Structures are given as structure tokens and as C-alpha cells.
Amino acid sequence: MITAESEHKIAPWKIEEVNKLKELLKNGQIVALVDMMEVPARQLQEIRDKIRGTMTLKMSRNTLIERAIKEVAEETGNPEFAKLADYIDKGAAIITTDMNPFKLYKTLEESKSPAPIKGGAVAPCDIEVKAGSTGMPPGPFLGELKSVGIPAAIEKGKIGIKEDKVVAKAGEVVSHKLAVVLSALGIKPVTVGLNLLAAYEDGVIYTPDVLKIDEEEFVQKIQDAYSKAFNLSVNAAIPTAQTIETLLQKAFANARAVSIESAFLTEKTTDDILGKAYSQMLAVAREVGDDALDDELKEKLSTAVVETKAEVEEAKEEEKEEKKEEAAPAAAGLGLLF
């Protein structure tokens, strides 16, 4: 905390800046630190336009940001918040927002854009120059291409690149000469934007490795977990708001099956029990001789046989119709070949 004794040793503008940062930190629901050292002015303005209305971005010196964080932690009695200062690095800036840390990380990643690589920078990936016309007229640029190992020649009045060429592998330092050539060719191998250093919410500090998730995989895991929990609840007969309907349906089906199997007559099972008994009666009748059957039972048995034959014939006719319907499109398809 800046005391009255030490204030005269600190530039007034620094005291004012720390106070502004403290006010921002105290009012922020979610507080995050980002690194913006490598972001060019043009891309920074584009990022500001993209995030406007969803978050507040405040740039300042690292030392002042650190002081503001620690003073807010002391004034609010929140030692966990002070740990956020440990993540200050490079060209740090403060972001405050009401987005949860996961959405904040995703938003910042989506706001990034491709940019030319600078001389002396490390290639983030293999940088490849594709074969084809550069669209540039013959001139000194032809020599520049060759000087960095790119096979080039004049083709149809324009400078053309003869073949694909990897000019820098991932991890290699890009020379200033190569960086100029790549920029002239419009090759932008670098992605620039605000890199999240850490985000603070309700006593927890989130780092990028935690916030970077595969959304589709994450949703699938949640769905799988829900499905397993649902099945466990149903099989263990644990009623919940989500499973009560399924449990009642299962209980009803089980009770109905027991009632039918044990021939216990109820309003819901009488028809099924009588139907089952009738079928069993006919099955027994078929096994005994005609002499043991009365006329009424013989008539019922013959009627059942006729109905069964009719059902079989109807099924055969339906099968024939299905085959005809399947054959018609095939014949039409063959007709198109001739």
C-alpha cells in the first residue's frame, strides 16, 4: 500500500494510475491478465473493436499492475487474489468482464488474427512457400527470392515460384531478409492477439492449460455421464425428477407382466389373460384327436387355422409388393445408362 511517507518519493502519475487500476480490479467480476507485447497497433485496434462491450482492457506497466493487485488483496483481505500477480509477464494488461473464464479464453482465442513474422522471431510452424505466380513484374524481387533459397524465374512476364519450398522449419529463427520476402508474398505464419496469462474468479485462478478444452469432446463426456447416471438411477430404482416417469413406466410394465403370468385379473390385464388362455386352449385342442372335441371347439379351431392362413397369404402378398417397389427404381436406374 502506498503510505503518506512514501508518496513524495513516487511520481504523482504513478499513484493516480495505481488507484485507477485498483478501482478497475475491485469492480471486476472476473479479472484476467493478458500478454499483449507482440500485438501490433493495427491488430490491437481490431481486437479492441471485437471485444468492445463485453470486457474492459486496461494497459499499464507491469510494476504498477502488480502493486495494484497486491494492494487490492490487502484491502479486501483476500490473499488468494494477490497470487494473481505471480502471472504477470511480458507486456501485461488487465481485463475485467462478467464472462466466465472458459468463455473469456475462447473469445480471446477467436479474436486473434494472422500476421507477418518479424526478423529474428522463431517460426511457430513449418513455413512453406507454394509454387505459382507471385503477380509481380520482373525486377529486384527475383534476386531476393533466390537469395533466401526460393527457386524462382520469370514466367509469362511475371515472377513465378517454380516449386513448393519450406523456407523455415518450426523452431528455427527467421532471418530479417526472409521475413521481408515472406511479408512481400503475403505469407502470415504468425497468429497475434491477446494471450491469456491467468484469470481469477471466486478465489480460483485459472491458467490457459485448464481453460483450453475441446468443446465437442467435453459435451460428449457430459452426455455420457448423464446417460450413465440416468441408467443407474433407473436400475437402482432411485426416483429423481429426470427418471420418475421412466421408473413408473417400468414398474407398470413389470406389474402387468406378473399379473398376466400369474393370471391375476385386474382391469388392465383381464383381456390379455383371457386372450392368453384362449390361445392355450386352441394349442391343446390341436394336440388331441377330433373325437375328443365338441363341435363348437372344432369350429373355433378351424376358424383359427383359416385366419392364420389368411395372415400368411397377406404377408406373402406384402412381401411381393415390396420386391416390386424395390425393383422399379433399379430398372429405372438401368434405363438411364442406355
From Swiss-Prot:
InterPro entries, A to Z: Ribosomal_protein_uL10, Ribosomal_uL10, Ribosomal_uL10-like_insert, Ribosomal_uL10-like_insert_sf, Ribosomal_uL10-like_sf, Ribosomal_uL10_arc
Gene Ontology cellular component list: cytosolic large ribosomal subunit
rRNA-binding as UniProt keyword: yes
Region (Disordered) residue spans: 309-338
Superkingdom of source: Archaea
CDD domains: Ribosomal_P0_L10e
GO process annotations (BP): cytoplasmic translation; ribosomal large subunit assembly
Key words of the record: Ribonucleoprotein, Ribosomal protein, RNA-binding, rRNA-binding
Residue stretches of biased makeup (Basic and acidic residues): 309-327
Coiled coil regions, renumbered to chain: none
Pfam family, any one: RL10P_insert
GO MF term list: large ribosomal subunit rRNA binding; structural constituent of ribosome
Subunit text: Part of the 50S ribosomal subunit. Forms part of the ribosomal stalk which helps the ribosome interact with GTP-bound translation factors. Forms a heptameric L10(L12)2(L12)2(L12)2 complex, where L10 forms an elongated spine to which the L12 dimers bind in a sequential fashion.
PANTHER family: 60S ACIDIC RIBOSOMAL PROTEIN P0 (PTHR45699), LARGE RIBOSOMAL SUBUNIT PROTEIN UL10 (PTHR45699:SF3)
Annotated HAMAP family: Ribosomal_uL10_arch (MF_00280)
Entry similarity comment: Belongs to the universal ribosomal protein uL10 family.
Stated role: Forms part of the ribosomal stalk, playing a central role in the interaction of the ribosome with GTP-bound translation factors.
Protein's name according to its UniProt entry: Large ribosomal subunit protein uL10
Protein's organism: Methanothermococcus thermolithotrophicus
